[in-house]
UniProtKB/Swiss-Prot annotation:
It comes from Dictyostelium discoideum. One of its GO terms (molecular function) is alpha,alpha-trehalose-phosphate synthase (UDP-forming) activity. This is Alpha,alpha-trehalose-phosphate synthase [UDP-forming] B. It is an enzyme of class 2 (transferase). Synthesizes trehalose 6-phosphate, the precursor for the production of trehalose, the main carbohydrate storage reserve of the dormant spore. Trehalose accumulates in both prestalk and prespore cells and then is rapidly metabolized during terminal differentiation of stalk cells, while being stored in spores, where it serves as the principal energy and carbon source for germination.
């Protein structure tokens, strides 16, 4: 079978050249070492079995003799770095700068020396200095012993201390200030992962509002029930939500993130993102899925190196006549290495025919230097060592061990050789954002068609459809998958491999980076109000107002004159609103109408002392402008249906915690703003379905508003009230403002009438008949106050 190669053209995404990309990540993609010292992380440890490892090493280090600093590029490039280098080479970005921590332990006096050495090594890297206290509290404490464990569902190991959080805030502020110091108006800021969740919000306080800020979340995002455990959960969400775009590895993580934001911050959730109201303005954060990839070309070139080919041949001689299973994991709890070893032991117990014919190469890379491990890591390391020794003692011989255990960081070239050799890759983390080892294995298996066994809890399981997917908690499933892979026909191996290979080839790190950056650029330009409807032109409205002799205002109440609140009774008018309405009514050329879904008693209580016109319950009752004007009732206000509808709504109120039923003189409304967001939305759909059966018997309208379902007599709506009023007034200035679907009836009534119609914010996915938009009720007050002073 021929493997079909598919190329992905980045130019098909967006042809526009982007500005400089400022990447902010906890770690720089380089290894920095003080002369004659080892780095905090990254130095190779000795191999446990020299028979199958060789030292290709990393790139030749750069050493500053005066500063005694040694710097070298990591042998295995980060996907983000690969993406930036490729995009720069293709002239698709102006340049790039990476801001991060070197993991090199220096004192404050040596910091200038370190910064200078890094600048001389490459202009693409900018160092953020962490002192030992920050390293302990921010990195080892809050990030690794708190956030990282929670994001990966490791609840038994989580620890939290207040000083850890304080240091986390401080380090995030350091990163924000460093970014702000190098930022220029055309730059695009790209922040990475859970270490820096507060940085976007901090940057909003340091940079102009038009700054383009994107955030990519590499780790899994947990369910709401887990995330809510964090003491500072709201601060973290608010921090990251100041981004224009947030990217995740899979839709599952987007769903969890939306759920946490809706429940903890009471935010409006849309299919494409989240709507945030803060300080009188609105911001929209787009959420999208961007599965990360690997640099295919880099791996392909590496496979053709003479030393890699030579190493593959030597390994084949060592393991001649044997099937090879490879696994590469970090020294941490989420990788599930002890369970894999238990599976392998059970396999050899149950199937002795594989003894001597099957070898398991377990690469176990340390994530910290010896002595810096946590107690859990030390126990884990000891457990794995003991298990490997026991299994090899049980099933091995002098000339052969069933498990080859490599407990060190190995070179890029050595990895490539092992990946190319292996017949099976066993990748079974308990939880992982993506796990690019799977992609790397697929690239290296271009000619061998090895089988990939993959945990269903790795993000890669949603991308690599040719894999055998297993539950990493089921030893039986894993063992059956290994046996299936060992006995798979070449035809099936090729079919499965081609599915994976085509995906990896099409979804490279460059494609991932380009997609994210182009979407970020677009999201920044558009924001929530950058739709087909332009922003309302206040100057044009004011100019028309000044020229007019007869002016009419049609104003919604909730969400328009006042901000939306959790309880209807809390939506009392502000003093500023009362003052503005009073000023407008002092001019005899003005007639002001508040047209609301509110009940009559509330409007009378809050606004009844003003000489304004009012219509309540969406047009059921109307009062003309002036003092002591009587209310008139619509002739269509029949209420025979009311008991039936009330009974249904009260039943849903009983079955939906946090919801409430509001009974007006005619209309009835079921509110679910205080209910669980997902369950409330589900119940709202169910309620509408039941109410439609009632509407078949009675002439009723069912209105779906913002977190509310209202039932009213048919033929009564805000648009009909507007038409009725305009029949009596020959106005040469009309201003109509509303914020939800019920106000669309007013906009429709005025669509062919010379007028100014404005929608306050609204649903991104919802079209409007309004001719302009504003972001919030505070902007409405600004406009009305401006007109009252004209």
């Amino acid at each position: 079978m021929t493997i079909i190669q598919r190329s992905t053209s980045l130019n098909n995404i967006i042809n526009e050249k982007l500005g400089k990309i400022i990447v902010a990540s906890n770690t720089l993609p380089i290894t920095v070492t003080k002369f004659n010292e080892t780095p905090l992380f990254g130095s190779p440890l000795s191999a446990s079995r020299e028979s199958i490892t060789s030292s290709f090493g990393m790139s030749e280090p750069s050493r500053d003799r005066e500063s005694k600093i040694q710097i070298q590029i990591n042998g295995h490039p980060f996907p983000t770095q690969s993406a930036l280098e490729t995009l720069k080479a293709k002239d698709e970005i102006e340049d790039w700068l990476w801001i991060g921590w070197s993991h090199c332990e220096v004192n404050e006096d040596e910091e200038p020396m370190l910064n200078q050495a890094i600048k001389e090594f490459s202009p693409h890297f900018e160092h953020v200095f962490l002192n030992p206290r920050q390293f302990e509290n921010y990195y080892k404490g809050y990030c690794k012993n708190g956030l990282w464990l929670l994001l990966h569902y490791q609840m038994n190991f989580i620890r939290m201390q207040s000083e850890w959080w304080e240091e986390y805030v401080g380090v995030n502020q350091m990163f924000a200030e460093k970014i702000a110091s190098v930022w220029r108006p055309s730059d695009i800021i790209w922040i990475h992962d859970y270490h820096l969740m507060l940085v976007p919000q901090m940057l909003r306080q340091l940079l102009p509002p038009e700054a383009s800020i994107g955030f990519f979340f590499h780790a899994p995002f947990p369910s709401y029930e887990l995330f809510r455990i964090l003491p500072n959960r709201k601060e973290l969400l608010k921090g990251i939500l100041s981004s224009n775009l947030i990217g995740f590895q899979s839709f599952e993580y987007v769903r969890h993130f939306k759920s946490s934001c809706a429940r903890l911050l009471d935010l409006e959730v849309h299919p494409k993102g989240l709507e945030i109201f803060e300080d009188g303005s609105t911001h929209f954060t787009k959420l999208q899925v961007y599965p990360i990839g690997v640099d295919y070309n880099d791996f392909a070139k590496n496979l053709n190196l003479p030393e890699v080919s030579s190493r593959v041949e030597s390994l084949r001689k060592i393991f001649k006549g044997k099937k090879v299973v490879v696994a590469r994991d970090r020294l941490d709890q989420i990788e599930g290495v002890p369970r894999k070893l238990e599976v392998f032991e059970q396999l050899l117990n149950d199937h002795p025919e594989y003894i001597g014919k099957l070898v398991f190469i377990q690469i176990y890379e340390p994530t910290v230097e010896e002595g810096d491990e946590t107690d859990e890591q030390k126990i884990l390391h000891k457990t794995v060592n003991e298990m490997v020794g026991r299994i090899n003692g049980k099933f091995g011989k002098l000339s052969f061990n069933p498990i080859e255990y490599i407990n060190k960081k190995i070179s890029y070239e050595e990895l490539s050789a092992l990946y190319k050799l292996a017949d099976i890759a066993l990748i079974t983390p308990i939880r992982d954002g993506m796990n690019l080892t799977s992609h790397e294995y697929v690239v290296c298996q271009k000619d061998n068609f090895g089988v990939l066994i993959l945990s269903e809890f790795a993000g890669a399981a949603r991308c690599l459809g040719g894999s055998i997917i297993v539950n990493p908690f089921s030893k039986k499933e894993i063992m059956e998958a290994i046996i299936e892979a060992l006995n798979m026909s070449m035809h099936d191996r090729k079919l499965k491999h081609q599915i994976n290979y085509n995906y990896v080839l099409a979804n490279t790190s460059s494609f991932w980076g380009k997609r994210f950056l182009c979407d970020l650029n677009e999201a920044t330009q558009k924001e929530i109000m950058e739709t087909s409807v332009p922003r309302a032109n206040f100057q044009e409205i004011e100019d028309s107002y000044k020229k007019a002799k007869v002016r009419v205002f049609f104003l919604d109440y909730d969400g328009t004159l006042t901000p939306l609140v959790r309880l209807p009774s809390q939506a009392m008018p502000s003093k500023q609103l009362i003052d503005v309405l009073s000023k407008l009514t002092e001019d005899r050329r003005n007639e002001v109408y508040v047209i609301s879904g509110r009940d009559r008693s509330s409007l009378e209580k809050w606004l009844g002392h003003l000489p304004i016109g009012m219509s309540c319950e969406h047009g059921v009752f109307t009062r003309q402008p002036g003092e002591n004007q009587p209310w008139t009732e619509s002739p269509n206000a029949e209420v025979q249906w009311k008991d039936t509808v009330l009974s249904i709504m009260q039943d849903f109120e009983d079955r939906t915690p946090g919801s409430m039923t509001e009974t007006k003189q005619v209309n009835i409304t079921w509110h679910y703003r205080n209910a669980d967001p997902d369950f409330g939305q589900f119940q709202a759909k169910e309620l509408i379905a039941q109410l439609r059966s009632v509407a078949n018997k009675y002439p009723l309208d069912i209105l779906s508003g913002k977190k509310a379902i209202e039932v009213k007599p048919i033929g009564i709506n805000k648009g009909e009230i507007v038409k009725m009023i305009l029949q009596k007034i020959d106005a040469d200035f009309i201003l109509c403002i509303g914020d939800d679907k019920t106000d669309e009836d007013m906009f429709k009534a005025l669509y062919n009438v010379p007028s100014f119609t404005i929608r306050v914010c609204g649903d991104l996915e919802e079209s409007t008949k309004a001719r302009g938009v504003v972001e919030s009720s505070s902007e409405v007050l600004t406009l009305l106050n401006r007109l009252s002073l004209s």
